[in-house]
C-alpha cells in the first residue's frame, strides 16, 4: 500500500513539474523550461512526454533518447491530459532532422543517434523492427536511417542497395530526405570507384540557382529540388562529393569549381579546404570483396588487405590450380625429361616448406630457375604450368605469369635501370616473372662487352633474386649456350638459379602430333596421306642443317612450325574447296574439314620458304 502511495506521489510530483515546464516553455522558452522537464523525469522516469520535452529543449544526451524510446508507449498521456502538443527535432542522417511526435519516429531518431554513437549493431536491430513503419511518412525516413548506418560503417554496396530500394506507392516523399539519400549514395559509389554512377545520383538533386540536372530522369526515378539556404550542410556536401568525383575521373578543372562551392555561409568546409589545397587528395576506393572480408561487419579496420584476400583466394583454389598446372604440363607433347624434372621439383618444394615450418635451413635453395632449349619447344607453356603449380603449392599467390623484356628493366640512361628493376620486382612479389631470351637483358658492344645500362639492371636483379628468393619466382629462358654465356657477365648470377630444365627439339612424330592437336579444335583433320607427307617432310627438315649450323627444325621453331603449317594448309584447303564449289561439284562437311597431302605439302614448302636459312633444303 505504501509503495502505491509513493508511486502516486511520484506521478503527481512529476506532473506538477511537467505542467510547469510546458507553461514556462511557451512563455520563457526552452532554456528556462528544461530544468522542470528534468525534474519531471527524475520524479517519474517513465514519463515519456517529459523525456520528449527534455529533448525538445536541447537535451542531446543519447541516454535521454534511449529513455524516451523505452517508455514511448506512454507518449501523449500527459499532453493529452492538459490539451497540449509537444514535438522535438532530432538529427537523422548527416545533415537533416526528423520531427518526433510518436513512438515510431522516436525509434527512427534513436537508430540514427545509435549510428552516430558507434552502436551499430543496436541501430541495425532497431531498424529491423517493422513497427517503425506504422506511417507512410516513415518509409523514406527509414530508408535514410538505414543508408546512413551503412554510410557511417563504410558498407558502400549496402548504401547503394538501400538507396535504390523502391518505396511503396503510398509512401510520402520529402525533397530533403531524397536529397540526403542521393548524397549518401553518391559517396558510396565514389568510394567503390564508380564515378559515373556517383554523378548519376548527384544529378537527381537540383540545387535551386546552382544546378539543374534532374530533368533527364524519368518519372520512375525519385528526384529533388532544394534551396541553397534550406540545408546548407547538405548543399555543401553535394558540391564536395561532386568535386571529388570529378577528381576521380581526372577532370580537375571541374573538381576545383565544385570544391570551391562546398561552403556554409560563404566559408569552405574543412574537407573542401583540404581537397583544394592538395590536388592529389582523393577519396579512398575499396571493393565489395574487401568489405565482405571484415571480421566485424561494422568495423572497416577489420577488413583484410588485398594481399590477404589474394592469399585466401589462392588457398581456396590451391587444389584446383595444382591439378590445372599438372594437366597443362601433361597435355604437352613429349617433354618427358621436363615433366619428370617438374615432378621432382614439386617434391623438393614440398619438403622445403616442411623444413621451413620446423625452422630447418634451406641454404642454396630458391624459387628461380632457367628453361633452356630451342624455340617452340614448350618453354612458355611450361612456365604457365609452373605458375599454376607454384600457386597451388602456396609458393606464389598469383598463378598468372608476367612476361617481361629488357625494356621492363632498363631505362634510357645510366642510373635509371637500377630503380626500374627494383620497382618491377617489388610489384611482382608473389608472382612469376618469365623472360624469354633472358640474355637480351644486356646488349653487347662491337668488342663484345655488355652495355652499362643492361649491366645496371643485371646487378640490381642479382640483389633482388637473393633478397626475395622465396617471395617470387623468376624464370629465364632461351638457348642454353647463350644463357650460359650470359650468366658469366656477373660471377654471382648463375648461383641465383639452382635448377635448369632442358628442352630438346621435337622429333618428327611429335611435330606431327602437335599439328594434329592444334588442328582438332579448329575442326580440321589431316587424312592419313597428309600425315605421312607431314612426317616425311619434318624428318627431312630435322636432318637439315642451316648455314649457321642450326638444326632445321630449330630454325623453324619446332612446335610453332607445326601450328604455322596447319594454318597455312587450311588456307590451301579453302582455296581448293572454293574451286570445287565454283566448278559445280558438291561440297560436303568432310570436304570443309579434311587437309589433304597436297594441302600439307604446299603448306610446308610455303612456310619454309619464309625462312632464308631453309633456302638450300632439298625435298
Curated annotation (Swiss-Prot):
Pfam families assigned to the protein according to its UniProt record, in alphabetical order: AAA, AAA_lid_6, T7SS_EccA1_N
Keyword Coiled coil on entry: no
Residues that, per the record, bind ATP: 373-380
Domain of life, source organism: Bacteria
GO cellular component, one term: cytoplasm
Localization of this protein: Cytoplasm
Keyword vocabulary terms for this entry: ATP-binding, Cytoplasm, Nucleotide-binding
Keyword Metal-binding in annotation: no
One annotated GO molecular function: ATP binding
Residue runs in coiled coils: none
CDD domains on file: AAA
Protein family membership: Belongs to the CbxX/CfxQ family.
Quaternary structure annotation from Swiss-Prot or TrEMBL: Part of the ESX-2 / type VII secretion system (T7SS), which is composed of cytosolic and membrane components.
Job description of the protein: Part of an ESX-2 / type VII specialized secretion system (T7SS), which exports several proteins. May have ATPase activity and might provide energy for the export of ESX-2 substrates.
NCBIfam families, A to Z: T7SS_EccA
Protein's name in the database: ESX-2 secretion system protein EccA2
Gene source species: Mycobacterium bovis (strain ATCC BAA-935 / AF2122/97)
Amino acid at each position: 500500500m505504501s509503495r502505491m502511495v509513493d508511486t502516486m506521489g511520484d506521478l503527481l510530483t512529476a506532473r506538477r513539474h511537467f505542467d510547469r515546464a510546458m507553461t514556462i516553455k511557451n512563455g520563457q522558452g526552452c532554456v528556462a523550461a528544461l530544468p522542470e522537464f528534468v525534474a519531471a523525469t527524475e520524479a517519474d522516469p517513465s514519463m515519456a512526454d517529459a523525456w520528449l520535452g527534455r529533448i525538445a529543449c536541447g537535451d542531446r544526451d543519447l541516454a535521454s533518447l534511449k529513455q524516451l524510446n523505452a517508455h514511448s508507449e506512454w507518449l501523449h498521456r500527459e499532453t493529452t491530459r492538459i490539451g497540449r502538443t509537444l514535438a522535438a527535432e532530432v538529427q537523422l542522417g548527416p545533415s537533416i532532422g526528423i520531427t518526433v511526435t510518436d513512438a515510431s519516429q522516436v525509434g527512427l531518431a534513436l537508430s540514427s543517434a545509435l549510428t552516430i554513437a558507434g552502436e551499430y549493431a543496436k541501430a541495425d536491430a532497431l531498424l529491423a523492427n517493422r513497427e517503425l513503419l506504422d506511417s507512410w511518412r516513415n518509409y523514406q525516413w527509414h530508408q535514410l536511417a538505414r543508408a546512413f548506418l551503412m554510410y557511417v560503417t563504410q558498407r558502400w554496396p549496402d548504401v547503394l542497395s538501400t538507396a535504390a530500394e523502391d518505396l511503396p506507392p503510398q509512401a510520402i516523399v520529402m525533397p530533403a530526405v531524397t536529397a540526403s539519400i542521393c548524397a549518401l549514395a553518391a559517396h558510396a559509389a565514389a568510394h567503390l570507384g564508380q564515378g559515373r554512377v556517383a554523378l548519376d545520383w548527384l544529378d537527381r538533386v537540383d540545387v535551386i540557382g546552382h544546378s539543374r540536372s534532374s530533368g533527364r530522369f524519368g518519372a520512375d526515378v525519385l528526384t529533388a529540388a532544394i534551396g541553397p539556404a534550406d540545408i546548407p550542410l547538405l548543399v555543401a556536401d553535394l558540391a564536395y562529393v561532386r568535386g571529388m568525383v570529378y577528381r576521380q575521373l581526372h577532370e580537375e578543372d571541374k573538381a576545383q569549381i565544385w570544391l570551391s562551392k562546398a561552403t556554409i555561409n560563404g566559408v569552405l568546409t574543412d574537407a573542401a579546404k583540404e581537397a583544394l589545397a592538395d590536388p592529389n587528395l582523393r577519396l579512398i576506393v575499396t571493393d565489395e570483396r574487401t568489405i565482405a572480408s571484415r571480421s566485424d561487419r561494422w568495423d572497416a579496420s577489420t577488413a583484410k588487405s588485398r594481399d590477404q584476400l589474394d592469399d585466401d583466394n589462392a588457398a581456396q583454389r590451391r587444389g584446383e590450380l595444382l591439378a590445372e598446372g599438372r594437366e597443362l604440363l601433361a597435355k604437352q607433347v613429349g617433354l618427358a625429361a621436363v615433366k619428370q624434372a617438374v615432378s621432382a621439383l614439386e617434391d623438393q618444394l614440398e619438403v622445403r616448406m616442411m623444413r621451413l615450418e620446423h625452422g630447418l635451413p634451406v641454404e642454396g635453395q630458391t624459387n628461380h630457375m632457367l628453361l633452356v632449349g630451342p624455340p617452340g619447344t614448350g618453354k612458355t607453356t611450361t612456365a604457365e604450368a609452373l605458375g599454376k603449380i607454384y600457386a597451388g603449392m602456396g609458393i606464389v599467390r598469383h598463378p598468372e605469369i608476367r612476361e617481361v623484356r629488357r625494356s621492363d628493366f632498363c631505362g634510357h640512361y645510366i642510373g635509371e635501370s637500377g630503380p626500374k628493376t627494383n620497382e618491377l620486382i617489388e610489384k611482382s612479389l608473389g608472382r612469376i616473372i618469365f623472360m624469354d631470351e633472358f640474355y637480351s637483358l644486356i646488349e653487347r658492344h662491337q668488342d663484345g662487352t655488355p652495355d652499362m645500362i643492361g649491366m645496371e639492371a643485371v646487378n640490381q636483379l642479382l640483389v633482388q633474386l637473393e633478397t626475395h628468393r622465396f617471395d617470387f619466382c623468376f624464370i629465364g629462358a632461351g638457348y642454353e649456350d647463350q644463357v650460359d654465356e650470359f650468366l658469366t657477365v656477373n660471377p654471382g648470377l648463375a648461383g641465383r638459379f639452382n635448377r635448369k630444365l632442358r628442352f630438346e627439339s621435337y622429333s618428327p612424330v611429335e611435330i606431327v602430333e602437335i599439328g594434329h592437336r592444334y588442328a582438332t579444335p579448329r575442326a580440321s583433320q589431316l587424312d592419313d596421306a597428309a600425315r605421312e607427307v607431314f612426317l616425311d617432310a619434318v624428318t627431312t627438315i630435322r636432318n637439315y642443317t642451316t648455314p649457321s649450323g642450326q638444326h632445321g627444325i630449330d630454325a623453324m621453331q619446332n612446335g610453332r612450325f607445326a601450328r604455322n603449317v596447319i594454318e597455312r594448309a587450311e588456307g590451301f584447303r579453302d582455296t581448293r574447296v572454293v574451286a570445287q564449289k565454283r566448278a559445280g561439284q558438291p561440297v560436303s562437311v568432310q570436304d570443309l574439314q579434311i587437309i589433304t597431302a597436297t594441302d600439307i605439302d604446299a603448306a610446308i614448302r610455303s612456310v619454309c620458304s619464309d625462312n632464308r636459312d631453309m633456302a638450300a633444303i632439298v625435298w
